[in-house]
Swiss-Prot record:
UniProt protein name: Glycerol-3-phosphate acyltransferase
Role this protein plays: Catalyzes the transfer of an acyl group from acyl-phosphate (acyl-PO(4)) to glycerol-3-phosphate (G3P) to form lysophosphatidic acid (LPA). This enzyme utilizes acyl-phosphate as fatty acyl donor, but not acyl-CoA or acyl-ACP.
GO biological process, one term: phospholipid biosynthetic process
UniProt similarity note: Belongs to the PlsY family.
Organism field: Thermosipho melanesiensis (strain DSM 12029 / CIP 104789 / BI429)
Gene Ontology MF terms: acyl-phosphate glycerol-3-phosphate acyltransferase activity
Transmembrane segments: 3-23, 50-70, 75-95, 109-129, 134-154
Record GO cellular component, one term: plasma membrane
Summary of subunit composition and partner proteins: Probably interacts with PlsX.
Length: 200
């Protein structure tokens, strides 16, 4: 029963497309706007800082709460729920099994299972996005650093964290190609939240 509950809770919460709903509050179909990705960065770029912040928060929180709700069952079930939350975000039943790239939701899982790894991710992400303004690059490097941190912390679940990270990175294949080609879009995330609203 714990397996079924963890799978259901994880997928259900992860599948709630908060970024889609939040963008709709401003009359935007995020699937048909900007990059078309159902995620916080696309909401930020096209709906502004307030809506972008909401999208980021809820995409993180839904994965966090899914893991938290099965905490009493033990670490194995937390990891199952977390994995299903990320899969739910990327393949949402509410969006015909389409969704985002899973970065914010993976971050939420990291925070819920091993908070230090979440802090490592956020620190690396913030530094790289501030320096390069490449959100995709910051996200991918942040995920890898967090996974490496968990490995050196001696946690058995580092393999799951690495798998989630690699899954999200694979969903960035178009971004990776654009980074290689030198035409990946830059986004001044910090500028958005401090009133600059700068987009490159």
């Amino acid at each position: 029963m714990e397996y079924i509950y963890s799978i259901f809770i994880g997928y259900f919460f992860g599948a709630i497309p908060f970024s889609f709903f939040i963008a709709k509050l401003k009359g935007i179909d995020i699937r048909k706007t900007g990059s078309g990705n159902v995620g916080g960065t696309n909401v930020l770029r096209n709906a502004g800082a307030f809506y972008g912040a909401l999208a980021f928060f809820f995409d993180i929180f839904k994965a966090y709460i899914a893991v938290f709700l099965v905490k009493g069952f033990g670490i194995k079930f937390m990891l199952i729920a977390g994995t299903m939350a990320v899969l739910g975000h990327c393949y949402s039943i509410f969006l015909k099994f389409k969704g985002g790239k899973g970065v914010a939701s993976t971050f939420g899982v990291f925070l819920a299972v091993y908070p230090w790894s979440g802090l490592v991710f956020f620190g690396v992400w913030l530094f790289i996005v501030a320096v390069t303004k490449y959100v995709s690059l910051a996200s991918m490097i942040g995920l890898i650093f967090a996974s490496i941190f968990v490995f050196f912390a001696g946690k058995d679940f580092w393999v799951i964290f690495l798998a989630l990270s690699l899954f999200s990175i694979l969903r960035h294949k178009d971004n990776i190609q654009r980074l290689i080609n030198g035409n990946e879009r830059k986004t001044d995330v910090i500028g958005y939240f401090f009133g600059k609203g700068k987009k490159n």
